[in-house]
Amino acid sequence: MTLLELQKELFLSKINSVECATKWKVLIVDTKTADIINHFITIHSLLEEKIAAVEILENPRTPNSSFEALYILHSEEKLVDCILKDEEYDKRYPGIHIVFLDMVKEPLINKLRTSRIASKIRTVQVAYLDFTSLESRYFQVHDSFSGLRLYHPSNAAIIRQELSKVAHGIFSVCVSLGISPNIRCYYPKNAPHASKTMSFILANQLSEIVEEYCSKHPGYHEAASKSTCLIVDRSLDTAAPFLHEFTYQAMIHDLLPIKNEQYPYEILGPQGTEKRTGKLDDDDLVYTTIRHMHMRDAIEKLMKDFNQFCIDNTLFLDKERATSLNDMRSMLAGLSDFQELRDQYSLHLTMAQECMNIFEKQQLNLIGAIEQDLSTGSNVEGKVPRSVLSELLPLLDEGNAEESTKIRLLLLYIIYRDGIILQDLFRLFRHSNLSTSREQIFQNLEQLGTRVIKNLTDQSSKRKEVANSLPAGEDVYELSRYVPTLKVVLENLIQDKLDPELFPYVRNTTPQTEVSMEQTSLRSSRPSWTRSRSMASKLPREKMLVFVAGGTTFSELRTCYELSDKYNKDIYIGSTVCYSPNEWLDFFSKFQQPREALKFPEDKPRHIPCLEARPSPNRIQEQPNIDVPSTRYENTSSSDAVSIHKDEKKSKGKSHKLGKLMMSSKKDKDKSKEKVPTYGTSDKKKKKRFGVF
């Protein structure tokens, strides 16, 4: 089961576990939760789960007295205040159910317990779903500013607080996967940079959270799958962010203007040229098939599959085979009866062709070759390159070369040389015609342990204890010889060869407690720690979790997919962000900028409209307001939800009328397959009401 499927499954099971007297319920989520669920479910799917309407918690709303309310939110005091605000309206929800997506602290529960809505609260639960599944094996936690917070000097005093938030997000993934991991971390004790303890601190915070949870749920540790969680940070591999990658996913994100996983393109249709916006996600089977292939292999796969489609489809008139990307684009114009397939092929053919055009124009074959020599420390013959600088200078002197390409080459050269003297750096800057303002990028790289400037008397030190090139004789493209450090580390971990000094255990674990292939458990909608051990043997694949603090790369994502297939394991990778090389340059340029220029979300006044709205008895109920994708996402997930109920006190009350289903729009109404009847008050039975507190 993929992370997307897992999270969707758990989310729906949590919704369906909430029993309302009104049968149907209003779902109210905060904006951050809306962003999470938009990746794996559509509003139309929610309406099929007895959800009458979906609304945003922070927006002004008028409660609907015909339905009970299900609030799904993060455990923040301001968001709880939004729930309390609803009670100020004349029309009020007859019952309230609350699900927190992350661990909730006792003061917040006490605030609900002593509030005026306490008697209406039916259930309070915690569903550990505070993470965003972006791919079948990739997730993000917290927010995209996290990496910058970890390295910006203004945040030095609150680094542990930031890492704690990240640790809670990782823990949500652990509970969702039903694992109680042995935790290891990257800890280069002798490294000179101050951030060398980052992974160690994060790993220990995660360990404390796991131990606290297990102390409150004694059965969890025994029933959960035993696995390994590896915590590393960006300093593990400082070369990977700057390399030109020539696998499909990495290359299109490096060279093309992809924003929020969307790419604008044009398609030739029966009526002429049509504009489209392609969405890159796991619903696109063409994309998931080729995203980790080398671009040449990806193009061959596209052409092969397209030609096979032409042969198999008797309705397709033009039976001639495509021999080039241009042939395929022309033939796609006749696929009007297969619009979804046509759009997918057109999107990826367009991107592949544009990448190859840029490859030729920017002479990336020459640039990529020297990048591989610098990053691996060897040439294609496996020997130490002797003429790196003489090959590098013409590329830096090239007037038409991209500035970002020159900076990336210089960074890789400095990493290769383990630093250069200051005068040499200035000479290289002049060759490259770079502004001195770009010097900040090089200086900031030192925060990750990379030596940039050295004295003539300084000796070069061995930066890494791992090899970053494939053994001689391996079948690999010359421009793809570099092996991400994370891949080497994970393979050593799988083979039980990982250095315990450089990658120590936390939680007093030892190598003898490593997981075995049989120690796994099945997923279901109930908390996984309640499942019997006999169920565990049905899942043979071992789970492994790796988290890269500070941000990850597309090559590292690919690594986890490759090793999962190679070793028959479920390896999941997480971070706070995945950047393209140019985004990494922008990231490293910001470390010394004034804090006000960076616009951290926490520095802006938080504007919550619903707390400022004045209740009006004549207010018209607003339509559900949630940003959902236009296409259905193939995602599902599971998480181990944990109840935090207090003893329930029963009280009597009458059942409320059910109004007609409020659709979010006319379009939604047309798409709804199920008609919802209007219930009257003819019920003679009185429903029992109870407060969770």
Swiss-Prot record:
What is the protein name stated in its UniProt record? Protein transport protein sec1
Region of interest called Disordered, as start-end residue ranges on this chain: 514-534, 606-693
Which subcellular locations apply to this protein? Cytoplasm; Nucleus
Q: Which family does it belong to?
A: Belongs to the STXBP/unc-18/SEC1 family.
Q: What does this protein do?
A: Involved in the final stage of protein secretion.
Report which superkingdom the organism of origin falls in. Eukaryota
Q: Does the keyword Nucleotidyltransferase apply?
A: no
Q: What spans are recorded as compositionally biased (Basic residues)?
A: 684-693
Give the compositionally biased regions (Low complexity): 521-534
What InterPro entries does this protein map onto?
Answer: Sec-1-like_dom1, Sec-1-like_dom3a, Sec1-like, Sec1-like_dom2, Sec1-like_sf
Compositionally biased tracts (Polar residues): 632-641
Regions of biased composition (Basic and acidic residues) lie at 665-676
Principal place of residence: cytoplasm
GO MF entry, a single one: syntaxin binding
The Gene Ontology biological process terms listed for this entry are: intracellular protein transport; vesicle docking involved in exocytosis; vesicle fusion; vesicle-mediated transport
Q: Which residues form a coiled coil?
A: none
Q: Respond yes or no to whether keyword Lipoprotein is given for this record.
A: no
A GO term from the CC aspect:
cell division site
